[in-house]
A protein has these predicted regions:
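Conserved catalytic core of the tyrosine transesterase superfamily
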Residues: 1-307
Length: 307
């Protein structure tokens, strides 16, 4: 007689398999856990071989849609459930995979393009961060440095957290980042941000070069969650609407889009962003519809007076 296993019974086994067998990063594991726990919270911790599991999945997706989740976010959760039920099926915990007939929503090109800030938005944030009537806390200097680093280096939030003092080369003007798969890359930094980093370090009572650059008042490394929360505080105090999407990753997209608009070659941008494939970087070329339109107007024969 088969045991009546619940959805949650194999969650830990699934996450261990993802980490050990597939080498998923801690952030990916956390995302899987979050999505599966969200699923259980909405549909209940029902039996994994429930004959209405496919209907439960569709109910879950409808709840997400009604709550305003984006198609991209819903697609991620579908991918998570698909992976989990495939794991259960391969290990013969379930006889059929309920995700077989569940399709991901179609995402239009404009929905899949990276979100980025206009230059005036970046200027507004940097100017506001230096306004002591808006930002008066001891964290204000950290906020300012954090935003400049995100925009200047286009680092992922985890990469930003992992910068150590020794990774900053003041003489040559670059920072060493550790990206996905612990791959290292060197990214240039503007002079003003370098001076700000030096001032930030000098303000510490004592330090050594192995310490992290961004730390809290207890000299502990900042976590991605802390930086994400800081950015939301900055967004609110700068007066942006709730609908405006501003996250650490948006600054990465913003820096990349602005560099591309200024004429940076895709291969150079790929090196800065740490993309293993140039196809990932090419999406920033699609973002620049303004430049594309200008080139079109200049070069297409139909825009000449002769036709």
């Amino acid at each position: 007689m088969q045991a009546n296993y619940k959805i949650s019974d194999f969650l830990e086994d699934f996450l261990i398999a993802k980490e050990v067998e597939e080498g998923c990063r801690p952030s990916t594991i956390r995302a899987y856990r979050y999505d599966l726990e969200k699923f259980i919270k909405i549909v209940g911790d029902i039996e994994i071989d429930h004959n209405l599991m496919r209907q439960k999945v569709r109910l879950f997706l409808k709840v997400l849609k009604d709550k305003g989740y984006t198609k991209k976010s819903i697609s991620r959760k579908i991918a998570c459930l698909r992976s989990y039920f495939k794991f259960l099926n391969l290990n013969e915990f379930i006889s059929q995979n309920p995700m077989n007939k569940i399709r991901s929503p179609k995402i239009r090109l404009e929905e899949s393009l990276p979100k980025f800030l206009d230059l005036k938005d970046v200027q507004k944030i940097l100017t506001s961060l230096q306004d002591r009537t808006k930002f008066r806390s001891k964290k204000s200097q950290r906020y300012y440095l954090m935003v400049r680093l995100l925009y200047s280096t286009m680092a992922r939030v985890s990469e930003l957290c992992n910068i150590r003092i020794r990774d900053v080369n003041f003489e040559k003007g670059y920072i060493r980042l550790r990206g996905k798969g612990n791959k290292e890359r060197i990214v240039p930094v503007d002079n003003k941000t370098l001076l700000l980093i030096q001032k930030h370090i000098d303000n510490r009572i004592k330090y050594n070069e192995d310490e992290y650059l961004l730390v809290n008042t207890r000299n502990e490394q900042l976590t991605p969650r802390v930086i994400q929360n800081d950015i939301q505080i900055i967004k609110k105090k700068c007066g942006f609407s709730d609908s405006k999407i501003i996250t650490p990753h948006v600054f990465r997209h913003t820096g990349a889009t602005h560099l591309r608009r200024s004429g940076m070659d895709i291969s150079e941008l790929q090196d800065i962003l740490g993309h293993s494939s140039p196809n990932t970087t090419r999406i920033y070329a699609k973002n620049d519809i303004t430049k594309l339109k200008q080139s079109y107007n200049m070069m297409h024969p139909l825009n000449s007076n002769d036709l």
